[in-house]
A protein has these predicted regions:
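Loop/turn elements at helix/coil->beta-strand transitions in domains of secreted/extracellular proteins
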Residues: 28-32, 58-61, 131-133, 154-158, ...
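Phosphate/oxyanion-binding active-site loops and adjacent basic polyanion-contact surfaces
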Residues: 3-14, 94-103, 207
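Primarily recognizes the serine-hydrolase "nucleophile elbow" in alpha/beta-hydrolase
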Residues: 115, 120-173
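Alpha-helix capping and helix-loop boundary segments enriched in small/acidic/polar residues
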Residues: 27, 41, 86-97, 136-137, ...
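The feature captures the conserved acid-bearing segment of alpha/beta-hydrolase catalytic domains
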Residues: 164-229
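Cap/lid segment of the alpha/beta-hydrolase catalytic domain
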Residues: 25-123
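Generic beta-strand/beta-sheet core signal
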Residues: 17-19, 35-37, 63-66, 137-139, ...
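N-terminal cap/lid segment of alpha/beta-hydrolase-fold proteins
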Residues: 1-29
Length: 229
């Protein structure tokens, strides 16, 4: 969990898919995998698209948590920050916490003392997940944020980044998904000549919690105490 504004613990949301193949017949250990949801999505995205069939066909237990900072619960605060960019620091700060939450979830998934000790993740008293490795797959926003997450993870050795990218200050003006948010931001900052400068200033803060700030760590230059990816 993270810390709320009043200093109290703030529980992190969690949803998982355990495929039937893990429960039918003799106990079989599945590969644990973290799923990163799309733009302003939520943890329940793990239940959508091809994820259930992927888990069944390839023997995986998929879990997800909200990528707070850019989850469905953050739309209001993001809109508020876009009309007053002095408040923008809230977004990258929460994104950093979202990365931490996913790191803890990954450790919980494959650690011998983690989720496998809970009856909900067992078959005939045995854990349904292996405890040797943990993996990541993200799509859209999850593919983008997965770059930073994998770069700092002490546990991931393989990640699948679908529609991966970096540098939100370059991505936003080129994305049709930003049109709705541009309708919020641009009336507050009507000078079009200032927009590139504003995006550049936003990026300075964003770098600490998106792939642009971790590109030099993603592949052959991992941080200390982390594996090669």
């Amino acid at each position: 969990c993270s810390i709320a504004i009043d200093g109290s613990p703030e529980p992190a949301n969690l949803e998982c898919i355990i495929p039937r193949v893990a429960l039918d017949g003799a106990p079989v250990e599945m590969r644990p995998m973290i799923y990163g949801h799309g733009l302003f999505g939520k943890a329940d995205g793990v239940n959508g698209s091809v994820n259930p069939q992927l888990a069944q066909d390839h023997g995986m237990v998929n879990c997800a948590t909200d990528e707070i900072g850019m989850s469905g619960y953050d739309i209001g605060s993001v809109a508020g920050a876009l009309v007053d960019l002095s408040q923008f620091k809230l977004l990258p700060d929460r994104l950093a916490q979202g990365i931490i939450n996913e790191l803890f979830l990954a450790r919980l998934m494959f650690h011998p003392g983690g989720l496998g000790t809970d009856a909900a993740f067992q078959n005939a008293g045995q854990p349904v997940m292996e405890n040797e490795n943990v993996y990541y797959m993200g799509a859209s926003q999850g593919g983008i944020m997965g770059g930073a997450l994998t770069a700092v993870s002490p546990d991931f050795i393989q990640s699948s980044l679908l529609v991966g990218a970096m540098n939100y200050s370059s991505l936003l003006p080129r994305s049709v998904d930003f049109d709705l948010y541009a309708d919020v931001m641009y009336p507050a900052y009507p000078d079009e000549m200032s927009h590139p400068l504003l995006f550049g200033l936003m990026q300075i803060l964003w770098d600490r919690s998106e792939p642009n700030g971790y590109a030099h760590r993603m592949t052959d230059n991992p941080p200390p105490n982390t594996p090669e990816h």
